[in-house]
Design a protein with these regions (language model features):
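C-terminal helical subdomain
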Residues: 173, 181, 196-232, 236, ...
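Alpha-helical segment proximal to the catalytic Tyr-Lys
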Residues: 119, 162-166, 234
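Substrate-binding pocket helix/loop in short-chain dehydrogenase/reductase
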Residues: 90-91, 95-103, 206
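Active-site helix of classical SDR
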Residues: 114, 149, 157
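Conserved glycine-rich cofactor-binding loop
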Residues: 12-14
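Short C-terminal tail/terminal secondary-structure segment
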Residues: 138, 226, 237-264
Length: 264
């Protein structure tokens, strides 16, 4: 990764932050993009990355991001599109504004990021990783906007991979399950209040039926993102790498048989 220039959206927290720390430790030139300056500056203090504050779903902001990146580093070798997070509520509970926010936060950010970086990526035969979710593959309760947008990321991954593969640009998607991040910690709060339990106990509860019986650490997902933009993954494009501890392989109806031994 030494001297490769990697653009990371959502770089101030969670998986984006973990990617920055991992790649910065390997000598990559980092471009750290997000809405809030303070967390980006904190990450940059450790990694030496270029901090760019703005909206990853804005074409105008991206024009500035790309210009600043070219001025500092000359071009772009990889994009990690980690921004996202909106979209709670069932369809009937989702207002027009909430729907637009879900699409903008989870899908538009990825599209605008890819479109803006592609000219430079084409020059360098670079790669893109879009951060999906287990919600790209399955539907949780009352997360209509988030689930729809994350499903659409798979289509975006495949479309980009099909269109730009002949010019040497690879595009892949990582779909984590539960990952211990500040955003996921917030999602544990209702369980903690309802069951009067700790954060660790809440994570244990949501992963109780996951084959590995635990959430991922952000660093584990960062390692997969690093692999996908490396030369070691040179034949991979259009792929969906599921990193969910095995939750998506569970045949849910058969859990009833496993639980027979739990009944008195």
């Amino acid at each position: 990764m030494r001297e490769r220039t990697v653009v990371i959206t959502g770089a101030g927290t969670g998986i984006g932050e973990a990617c920055a720390r991992r790649l910065g430790a390997e000598g990559a030139n980092l471009v750290l993009i997000g809405r809030r300056r303070e967390p980006l500056e904190r990450v940059a203090a450790e990694t030496g990355g270029l901090v760019l504050v703005g909206d990853a779903a804005s074409s105008a902001d991206w024009a500035g991001f790309v210009a600043a990146t070219r001025e500092r580093f000359g071009g772009i070798d990889a994009l990690l599109a980690c921004a996202g997070g909106h979209g709670l509520g069932s369809a009937t509970d989702t207002s027009d504004d909430a729907w637009q926010a879900a699409m903008r936060g989870n899908l538009d950010t990825a599209f605008h990021s890819a479109r803006a970086c592609l000219p430079s990526l084409l020059e360098r035969r670079g790669s893109i990783v879009l951060l999906g979710s287990i919600a790209s593959l399955a539907a949780g309760p009352e997360v209509c906007g988030y689930t729809t947008a994350k499903h659409a990321l798979l289509g975006l991954t495949r479309s980009l991979a099909r269109d730009y593969g002949p010019q040497g640009v690879r595009v892949n998607c990582v779909c984590p399950g539960w990952v211990r991040t500040p955003m996921a910690d917030e999602e544990m709060q209702p369980l903690m209040r309802h069951y009067e339990e700790s954060l660790d106990a809440a994570y244990a509860r949501v992963t109780a039926e996951v084959p590995l019986r635990r959430p991922a650490q952000a660093e584990e997902i960062a390692a997969l993102c690093r692999f996908l933009i490396s030369d070691e993954a040179s034949i991979l494009t259009g792929a969906t790498l599921v990193a969910d501890g095995g939750s998506s392989i569970v045949d849910l109806p058969t859990l009833a048989y496993e639980r027979m031994g739990d009944t008195p």
